[in-house]
């Protein structure tokens, strides 16, 4: 057993209001520069819908994730070393700019400089790639906002497998959800296995997956290998880039920018301890629907004395273990089993999990589509949203989704009876296997969601990450693991590096 720590994230979809604040702040901080205009490390999609890029969940088309062989081994779906080498100069599984969208801006200056005329001046769109005038904007990262496109296009959503999409049309006005997406920072990242240059690595201290900008050669196999399509090619620098989980903030014990600015308080950050030796075993599980339960088994109890002892022997600091004991991610994913992984069938073991939304169930109940099971809506009676959520979060297994939804409904019914009627309805808790203490904790974390409860992030121990801190002082900033090799003419932000031989004339501030 080799114990490692991972900073994971949980998003409570039941509270997401679709405001896109997380997307805008992430965009302003990380990708508002030439070459990355089309890239959104964090984006919010409206489901059902085909998403961004188009049909990213259709792995028959994009070949993302892993596939299990007959002998029990797993390989990237895009193929082994020889297939990757054969297609290295012409990747057939690569999304084009039209699958994302052509980024644009508007000629706002024309509103100020237009000559006097009989018509009001207009700010027309202009491409940020070619600089040419765009006659028509045809797609965007949130084009399907609030079910904005016709159902004929949205029915291509891969999560409609084994769902009668035609019948779904009856519930179209009551079944909608927001899905914020970012890099999953997987335990078994397919992007790292797909990279011919070996430029993608996973940090041991916090599990964040990064791309070494010095080693990256722009082959773009990682884009095909990632089933979530959260790696983007910077056409200006010729490098691939992705969400870095705001690791400079994480190292300082601060939440990511998307989590810090979330209006709905839907994001939770915390540490999980896991057994790194079992990653291949879990990812090679025969039945795809068993992957969720198998991934739960890989997480270790941070209160177990044997786990604590082994973690210390494996170099996990005590501060990280203490953070894991207070982790909201562990509570929601392992203890309460409310949070579920996004498409575990990709076998990447994702580490950004989601609490399924109650809104489709409650809205349908209010519209009379759902019968009541005592005081709780009968989740089984609304098969379409349940099957859809199962395809999205548990590889089609409906039982974990049903349990999570029933537990959240039970918490609401219990707290309503307690606060409105002044009684404790213990029967509703017994029906879903929860104690009073667990429900009180769930209410505290889900409803009140204080800052210190949502974000439990230990500060990094940088003194243990390098052998000689004095020699590294003022060295090269964010070097991404390969030191100051200087192999690239651009830095991580796409700008040209300064010539170190330039002589800067000093300014004398005082007289001798």
Describe the predicted segments one by one.
Residues 1-512:
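Non-ligating segments of multi-cofactor redox enzymes
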């Amino acid at each position: 057993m080799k114990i490692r720590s991972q900073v994971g994230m949980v998003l409570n979809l039941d509270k997401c209001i679709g405001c896109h604040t997380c997307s805008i702040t992430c965009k302003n901080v990380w990708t508002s520069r030439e070459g990355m205009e089309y890239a959104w490390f964090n984006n919010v999609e409206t489901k059902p819908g085909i998403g961004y890029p188009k049909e990213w969940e259709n792995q028959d088309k994009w070949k993302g994730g892993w596939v299990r062989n007959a002998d029990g081994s797993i390989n990237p779906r895009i193929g082994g070393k020889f297939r990757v080498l054969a297609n290295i100069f012409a990747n057939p599984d690569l999304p084009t700019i039209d699958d994302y969208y052509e980024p644009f801006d508007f000629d706002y200056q024309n509103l100020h400089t237009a000559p006097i005329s009989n018509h009001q001046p207009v700010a027309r769109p202009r491409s940020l790639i070619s600089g040419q005038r765009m006659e028509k904007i045809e797609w965007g990262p949130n084009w399907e906002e609030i079910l904005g496109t016709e159902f004929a296009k949205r029915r291509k959503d891969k999560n409609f497998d084994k769902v009668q999409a035609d019948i779904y049309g009856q519930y179209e006005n009551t079944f909608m959800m927001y899905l914020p997406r970012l890099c999953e920072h997987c335990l078994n990242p397919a992007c790292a296995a797909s990279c011919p240059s070996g430029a993608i690595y996973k940090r041991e201290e916090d599990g964040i997956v990064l791309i070494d900008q010095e080693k990256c050669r722009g082959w773009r196999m990682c884009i095909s290998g990632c089933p979530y399509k959260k790696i983007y090619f910077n056409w200006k620098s010729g490098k691939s880039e992705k969400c870095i989980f705001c690791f400079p903030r994480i190292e300082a014990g601060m939440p990511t920018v998307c989590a810090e600015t979330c209006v709905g308080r839907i994001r939770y950050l915390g540490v999980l301890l896991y057994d790194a030796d079992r990653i291949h075993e879990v990812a090679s599980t025969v039945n795809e629907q068993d992957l969720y339960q198998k991934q739960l088994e890989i997480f270790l109890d941070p209160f177990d004395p044997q786990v604590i002892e082994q973690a210390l022997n494996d170099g996990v600091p005590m501060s990280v273990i203490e953070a894991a004991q207070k982790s909201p991610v562990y509570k929601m994913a392992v203890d309460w089993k409310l949070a579920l992984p996004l498409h575990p069938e990709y076998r990447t073991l994702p580490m950004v999990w989601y609490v399924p939304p109650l809104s489709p169930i409650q809205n349908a109940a209010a519209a009379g589509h759902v019968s009541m099971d005592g005081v709780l809506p009968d989740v089984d009676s609304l098969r379409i949203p349940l099957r859809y959520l199962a395809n999205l979060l548990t590889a089609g297994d409906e039982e974990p989704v049903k349990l999570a939804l029933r537990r959240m409904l039970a918490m609401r019914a219990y707290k309503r009876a307690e606060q409105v009627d002044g009684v404790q309805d213990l029967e509703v808790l017994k029906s879903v296997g929860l104690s009073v203490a667990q429900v009180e904790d769930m209410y505290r974390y889900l409803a009140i969601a204080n800052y210190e409860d949502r974000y439990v992030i230990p500060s990094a121990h940088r003194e243990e990450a390098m052998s000689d801190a004095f020699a590294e002082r003022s060295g090269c900033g964010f070097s991404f693991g390969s030191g100051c090799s200087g192999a690239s003419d651009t830095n991580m932000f796409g700008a040209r590096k300064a010539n170190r031989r330039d002589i800067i004339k000093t300014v004398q501030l005082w007289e001798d």
